[in-house]
């Protein structure tokens, strides 16, 4: 597939419900804090904070979710086409 990259600006408290992708997704936290979790149900108490400079690679098919803490900007990249499938 072709390489893609895009920025997402997330206001404080933005929630991204459980979902998965057909391809590996790379996330680079540009500013703010992104809370991330793995599983089929969003559980804020089990989320891991990623701060500016953190880079994670999320394997294809892994059920995950996220939430911003404060205004947050992330860069998402990978080899497309990117697909997003909700868990529920």
Tell where the protein language model's regions lie, with residue ranges.
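Short beta-strand His + acidic residue motifs that chelate non-heme Fe in jelly-roll/DSBH
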Residues: 16-18, 36-37, 58, 63-69
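Double-stranded beta-helix
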Residues: 45, 65-88
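A short glycine-rich, His/Asp/Glu-containing loop-to-beta-strand
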Residues: 1-17
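Short acidic-glycine-tyrosine-enriched beta hairpin
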Residues: 11, 34, 40-61
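A short, N-terminal "cap"/entry segment at the start of jelly-roll beta-barrel domains
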Residues: 1-4, 47, 88
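Extracytoplasmic
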Residues: 3-5, 22-24, 61, 69
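Glycine- and acidic-residue-biased ligand/ion/polar-headgroup-sensing regions
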Residues: 11-14, 21-41
């Amino acid at each position: 597939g072709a390489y893609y990259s895009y920025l997402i600006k997330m206001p404080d408290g933005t929630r991204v419900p459980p979902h998965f992708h057909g391809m590996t997704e790379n996330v680079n936290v540009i500013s703010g804090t992104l809370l991330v979790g793995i599983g089929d149900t969003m559980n804020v108490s089990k989320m891991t904070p990623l701060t500016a400079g953190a880079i994670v690679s999320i394997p294809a098919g892994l059920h995950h979710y996220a939430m911003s803490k404060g205004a947050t900007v992330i860069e998402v990249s990978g080899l497309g086409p990117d697909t997003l499938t909700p868990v529920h």
